[in-house]
Regions:
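Cys-dependent protein tyrosine phosphatase-like superfamily
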Residues: 1-86, 101-141
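A phosphate-binding catalytic loop at a beta-strand-loop-alpha-helix junction
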Residues: 86-97
C-alpha cells in the first residue's frame, strides 16, 4: 500500500485511490472505504468500484467551505457501523486528517494544539488552511 498511510491500528488514510489501489486494499485486509469527496470532484464515484471488489463503501461529502460538526459525527458513526480495517480518503487526504483528528479530540478531550499535532503526525498542516484552522478553533472551544 504505497500511498496508504497507516495512522493507527485498522485505519489507513490516502489520497484518491485508483482501481489498482482498491484491489491492493482488499488484499491487505481493508474492509471499508470511507470517501470524503464531493460528487463534483470526480466524474465517477468510488462506490461501484469499491463494492465490485467486495468492500463496504461510505461517502461523507466534505466541502472545505461548509465544514460542520455533523461530519465528525458521521465519521464516528461510519466507523462504529462498519467493519474495519478502514481506508479513509479524499483528493489529497487533508480532509481525512482534519476529521479524524477532530474525532480523536472529541474522544480524548484534546486541545486545539493536540488536534494540529495529530494532523501533522498524519502528514498534514491544518494551520496552513484558513478554513481548516478556523474549523478546529470553532470545534474545540
Amino acid at each position: 500500500m504505497s500511498q496508504f498511510k497507516r495512522v493507527e491500528d485498522g485505519i489507513f488514510i490516502a489520497p484518491q485511490p485508483t482501481e489498482q489501489d482498491i484491489q491492493e486494499a482488499k488484499q491487505q485486509g481493508i474492509r471499508t472505504v470511507i470517501d470524503f469527496r464531493l460528487s463534483s470532484e470526480t466524474a465517477t464515484s468510488n462506490e461501484t468500484l469499491t463494492k465490485n471488489h467486495g468492500l463496504a463503501y461510505v461517502n461523507i461529502p466534505v466541502n472545505k467551505a461548509a465544514l460542520s460538526a455533523s461530519q465528525i459525527s458521521d465519521l464516528d458513526a461510519a466507523m462504529k457501523g462498519k467493519e474495519g480495517p478502514f481506508l479513509l480518503h479524499c483528493e489529497t487526504g487533508a480532509r481525512v486528517a482534519l476529521l479524524l483528528s477532530l474525532s480523536k479530540a472529541k474522544q480524548h478531550d484534546w486541545t486545539t494544539e493536540q488536534v494540529f499535532a495529530e494532523a501533522k503526525r498524519m502528514g498534514f498542516d491544518l494551520k496552513s488552511s484558513p478554513e481548516f484552522s478556523a474549523f478546529v478553533m470553532r470545534t474545540i472551544d
